[in-house]
Design a protein with these regions (language model features):
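Short, positively charged and aromatic/hydrophobic N-terminal segments
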Residues: 5-6, 10-12
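Sec/Tat signal peptide C-region and signal peptidase I cleavage site
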Residues: 34-40
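Start-of-domain marker
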Residues: 41-107, 118-120
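A cross-kingdom marker for long, charged
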Residues: 48, 234-319
Length: 319
């Protein structure tokens, strides 16, 4: 009996040690996983290089370029913010090649889009959607894409970095008032340091919708109401609608008054127009169940901000 008791105690002790070892191993694995998630890169970018306009060229250079851009955007840590893998910003970079020469010169359009999830909804809302028609650069197959914030000597990586910073900064602004300032300052820095490379899109007095104009306009103090709009519209408005649709819609209506203020304070700004183009269908849907008073007020503001879409804004009244 003593032997049996000793054996039982020994066996119990062994099971306890194995259990403790299992728990310790599990904790270490979880800590490692959480640490890995906390330092995940910010972007989950889908990249497409469309070369359908280019005939009689070895297609491998376009495939290699697509892979290189994807790795450049998704493997780099662009900010000091902590992102879990599930928090990555879903975005797309569609590079349309208009011209290509064998010496590696590309003339392209770049369509950039980014979205963020709406709280408690199986729905993503578009935050940024822009077509850059002045993306020219040099790239030889298998070139490594490298980038330095302070020394800009490659237009392709400068453009990609600029939009990466812009996307992240805008996304942060939707979650906290002016939350993306530090990252948006990096986008401004890219613009300033790209002045000397002699490529289109960076100059202060170029196209009113070029890269310089876009970030300079956004960071102008006169456009602070626009940055507040991004927070109020998304965080107080859309994110609230799953829990209380009436309150969320009311907050969106209030936020759109900031859009009107932006238009009045800086009538030449392109940002209010871009916002209405991006949010057009979403706004029509949001107000499909709005009150008559809400519909009238929103229709008035939107027709003032972007009269070219009056036909669309009238759908708000018709719903």
């Amino acid at each position: 009996r003593s032997f049996i008791r000793i054996f039982a105690l020994s066996n119990s002790s062994m099971r306890m040690k194995m259990t403790i070892r299992y728990i310790v191993t599990l904790v270490i694995a979880l800590v490692g996983l959480l640490s890995q998630q906390a330092t995940a890169q910010e972007l989950e970018a889908k990249v497409v290089v469309n070369h359908s306009k280019i005939q009689g060229t070895n297609n491998s250079v376009f495939t290699t370029l697509q892979e290189a851009i994807t790795e450049f955007l998704n493997s780099r840590k662009w900010s000091n913010a902590q992102y879990a893998t599930r928090e990555k910003i879903v975005c797309s970079f569609n590079l349309i090649v208009n011209e290509y020469s064998d010496d590696g010169r590309f003339a392209c359009n770049l369509m950039v889009q980014a979205s963020r999830p709406v709280y408690n909804a199986s729905y993503n809302t578009t935050v940024f959607n822009f077509n850059d028609n002045a993306v020219d650069f040099n790239y030889i197959e298998h070139d490594k894409l490298e980038f330095s914030d302070e020394i800009i000597d490659n237009n392709l990586t400068a453009v990609l970095a600029y939009y990466a910073y812009l996307i992240i900064g805008l996304d942060m602004d939707t979650f906290a008032p002016k939350g993306g300032t530090d990252v948006l300052n990096k986008a401004e820095n890219v613009v300033n340091n790209a002045q000397m490379i002699g490529e289109d899109g960076w100059k202060a007095f170029g196209d009113s919708k070029n890269r310089h104009a876009l970030v300079n306009d956004y960071m102008n103090g006169a456009m602070d109401p626009y940055r507040q709009l991004l927070y109020d519209y998304h965080r107080k408005g859309l994110d609230e609608m799953a829990q209380n649709a009436e309150r969320g819609r009311s907050n969106i209506t209030t936020s759109l008054a900031l859009l009107e203020k932006c238009k009045q304070d800086k009538p030449m700004s392109v940002l209010p127009q871009l916002f209405t183009e991006i949010k057009k269908d979403e706004l029509i849907n949001v107000y499909s169940k709005g009150t008559s008073k809400e519909k009238e007020e929103v229709n008035r503001i939107l027709c003032l901000v972007n009269p070219s879409l009056t036909t669309d804004w009238d759908k708000i009244m018709d719903n």
